[in-house]
Amino acid sequence: VKCGIVAVFVVLMSCLGNAHAGEVQPSVVVQQIKGRPVIDGILNEEEWMQAKKITNFGQVEPREGEEVSERTEVLLMRTSEALYLGVRCFDRSPSEVLARDRRRDSTGSGDDRLRIVIDPFARGTEGYFFGIAAGGSSADGIVRAGNRPEMEWDCIWDVRTRVTAEGWVAEIEIPFRSIAFEPNQESWGFNIERVIRRKEEKLRWASPTRKKLLYAMEGAGRITGMRDLKTGLGLDVRPSLVSRWREEMGGSNTFEIVPSIDAFFRVTPSLTTTLSWQTDFADTEVDKRVVNTTRFPLFFPEKRAFFLEDARYFRFGGIRRSPLPFHSRTIGLSGNGERVPIEMGGKLTGKVGDWNLGLLGVGLEGKGGVEADDVFAGRVTYDLFKESQVGVIVTDGDPRGNGSARTYGLDFHLKDSSYLGRDGKTGELIGWLMQTDGDGLDDYGWGLTGIYPNNPLYMRVGLQRVGKDLDPAMGFVRRPGIYEFSSFFSYEFESGGRNWNEIDFDFSAGFDADLGGQILSEDFEFDVTFERKGGGEYNVGIEHERERFLEDFEILDGVIIPVGDYRHTRVFGGFSTPSSWRWGSRLKLSAGEYLGGQRQGIDLEMFWKPSSQWATRVSVNNDWNQLPGGDFETFVVNGALQWTPTTELLLTTDLQYDNLSEKVGINGRVRWTVKPGSNVYFVVNQSLTKMGPE
């Protein structure tokens, strides 16, 4: 099977040809200035008169290649310490500019907005993302291999927006000390995109075509003259003081004050050392409540700032969730999920020439039967050709207990974005090999994935082996002892009709088999999505699954799934309203067979944005199951209320409940941004548990 997948992918890529793209991307020289403009969203300083100007935007959606409906003007300049952008988004109906979102770390998807990508190394494989909405919201992230941004990254930068009589304006400052770059690289990748939300119109500077996403960095333009850049001392120290009061059932109260320090030092403009003492994560966002009715563990993403910073340097083998050799979420938690305090942590991340480094060491305090210990993760990759990499990963230590454990891995990522001549089609081939050793359990795994990540056709096919005893102590494995095949095919059809923007056809197929080749589970899904020109979608689909149970499984207290081979088919459908509406919803309904019985489900999310200061959201997931072993219902609700009186102040209240644990969780957070990079938090967590029938 493995050889067959490789052969199919190689033949596919060979048929595509290997002619290099001849498309010439636009470029602009960035003028250096002496003075620093005031970031206030006005653009009235004399320095802006010296800035280079970009005006040649092309329409991407809804009518690719046609004239844009509104003019956009981008001003670019820099000092030796920062890059400055001034963007004038002209609009002949300024009263209709959508500017309702003020939140930091929000993409402002319902507002008129700008999206910017910067590639300081000009390799076309990864870069930085900056999102700005007309209401003042801002977001940042890391772009890798044409995928959507990883929004966990947090950058120190500044932006101010202002709605004017001519449209709206954004003024942006990106300090060079906040991003990694190569001092000898004077030409950077750069692209900018504007969205006029009420028209669902998308305009772009470089590669204004549906065939390339903004995040496909190989399609970016160039900004030149990026020389003699400075990062200052390269030292950033962030002291913090956490006061915590805890009240438990029974009347016991505790109060403590914990000081901590985070320090960042840029060894070079592209290499950073991070140190953290008495790391505290009180300000971390809570996980969304979910109910697990499967036989396998759930995956929860990392949300702690210390581990999210430069997390991309530890990515391995293109693996999304399982089997991960390293998942930092395991650090600071014992095997039974109890919190283990982190005494000290250190990282070295960045680039040295063609080498990419990620080194992490953490000292854990002893708690709950887990002795004090140190854990380590190291990741090194080497840039091949223009867009490819090979690398290794090593982890040492077991944060879950007192045993010893090591993981070793080798991977490669081959990418070429020059297929089919000037059309610039991209092909990728990713492979990995992993070995774990610890407490007498030694095993290995491997994986191979081929990707054709293009538009209108997208394809991904992969196969991986996960050994029965493969157990990365600092990673995550959902299901050991299997061969796992997965595939996904998508085609976007531009309708050209009056009401529809595009129609998407998606098909996925996958199976798990034991190491002897016996099928354990199968999953086939086909769905069609209709995207309206004014925003919003309609979706219908069908799914067929097969599950083999080799032993009885208690899906819920008293509800047993007997040994057997179960096949079931379900249909689903739903819709979502445009994100530009003040109120709206997303609904998905499903019904059909399930494990020898029936299941009906509803997944509903509603939002209301009455003004730029207030926003609320409620989501409900409800499943009704009628099985031979018994009937049961799962009900999960998540709600949030947000108040943003200014772009610097955010108050959020989250409420969560599920009917299985019968627990209500309440999380209140106040975040005051004193200045970019300096925040004050006030956090309240409350858990309510039903103790009796009343």
Task: Give short role names for the model-derived ranges.
Residues 239, 257-263, 271, 277, ...:
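Extended, hydrophobic alpha-helical segments in both membrane/secreted and soluble proteins
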